Amino acid sequence: MASEQDVRARLQRAGQEHLLRFWAELAPEPRAALLAELALLEPEALREHCRRAAEACARPHGPPPDLAARLRPLPPERVGRASRSDPETRRRWEEEGFRQISLNKVAVLLLAGGQGTRLGVTYPKGMYRVGLPSRKTLYQLQAERIRRVEQLAGERHGTRCTVPWYVMTSEFTLGPTAEFFREHNFFHLDPANVVMFEQRLLPAVTFDGKVILERKDKVAMAPDGNGGLYCALEDHKILEDMERRGVEFVHVYCVDNILVRLADPVFIGFCVLQGADCGAKVVEKAYPEEPVGVVCQVDGVPQVVEYSEISPETAQLRASDGSLLYNAGNICNHFFTRGFLKAVTREFEPLLKPHVAVKKVPYVDEEGNLVKPLKPNGIKMEKFVFDVFRFAKNFAALEVLREEEFSPLKNAEPADRDSPRTARQALLTQHYRWALRAGARFLDAHGAWLPELPSLPPNGDPPAICEISPLVSYSGEGLEVYLQGREFQSPLILDEDQAREPQLQES
């Protein structure tokens, strides 16, 4: 272990010697922990990190003055539309995706480094239950979708296949996530095919470039954003693991989307047939000012432009068909070839510019008292996973329906948007639509038919509660055998073992 003198000298070179100001008050064990933490901070890199954070925070916020002139929509030939393509085109995409899955060439990679702080919980988001009748967590829903897509691909091609699940965690989520998976027997996935790894942490910094102490013996650290993926892939030799398994295509997604289709064969097949090295799923923006990043081109290269960087005038622009010109909303759902990820980790990652997140960071004051600030007092520097789009040689985007594939969980109740209630509604409404399409009818408590409402307003409750296990249906397929021509009272819960139908009433 580095000595106090060594660490103090390193901190002086970085201009951060204040981190040892409580040294004399610490007992041996906290001293050792603090030294171990500080020894990991390389002086030159730390000085540069603090300088860049302070400079970035001091820069004027808002859109670059010339951005509107540099902005263009994605070329039409690089954009597919899952819902508006002809059935034969969609079938070809799906069949190619299933073929690649059956050859064990597809992996999924979950971005799960964040805690559920905005949800009002201290554990990882993936462990959250939104109130489904089955009481399933996000992690369980995702694991079961992997199992189902493996099954579907295997049945189509007469083989057994595996979709490895890579889970990027942070110091805050690795332990609870690993324990949760063990407690639930990895949701019946082979543990050898679930690979967890940690992203890096970066110190939080004051507005004048000083690292924050959250305790007398601990630096305030935060994950380096979902764009920390690329350093983490290199740190933990994840691409080498993928190569050993024969993985060529990687589906990267964020933990909080309850409707996410893992290893979606339509998306995989679309990107493979396009020859894409990098791709993104997008949804049509709900309205011009919707706070979502836009996938577009800047100076001729693909990029996600944050909503705060687009002027109201640009956001309102319309295409010739009346749709928004910049309407490709980013949903953190991406496709990469392993070769592209290798190039990013080896060549392009140092070119990624960190983004400033101004936060309320707890700290100890000069007297050593813990302070929980009421307004933002610090800077956390983050990289974004989509910042690598500009390095793609062949970028493609697939537009999907929001009501089928995107309902994020970000806010605690009683928020109007992106809450447990809206996520639960999105999934149950989707399953209700699937049941109607499969020929089910629903009855009220008196045995009368409920109205069939295949199209519901946003955040509206379906007339009947219907939950379908991902192990029964991945995207609405194969339900006729259970539901065709039958009548059910709410709630209908269709699990993998049988059609479990509480208060079932046959016609």
From Swiss-Prot:
Top-rank taxon: Eukaryota
InterPro entries for this protein: Nucleotide-diphossugar_trans, UDP-sugar_pyrophosphorylase, UDPGP_fam
Binding site for UTP: 111-114, 125, 199, 225, 256, 380
Keyword Transferase annotated: yes
Location of the region described as Disordered in the Swiss-Prot/TrEMBL record: 56-91
Biased composition (Basic and acidic residues): 78-91
GO biological process, one term: UDP-N-acetylglucosamine biosynthetic process
Residue numbers binding substrate: 226, 410
Cross-referenced CDD domains: UDPGlcNAc_PPase
Family membership noted in the UniProt record: Belongs to the UDPGP type 1 family.
Protein name per UniProt: UDP-N-acetylhexosamine pyrophosphorylase-like protein 1
Organism field: Homo sapiens
Highest classification ranks of the organism: Eukaryota, Metazoa, Chordata, Craniata, Vertebrata
Gene that produces this protein: UAP1L1
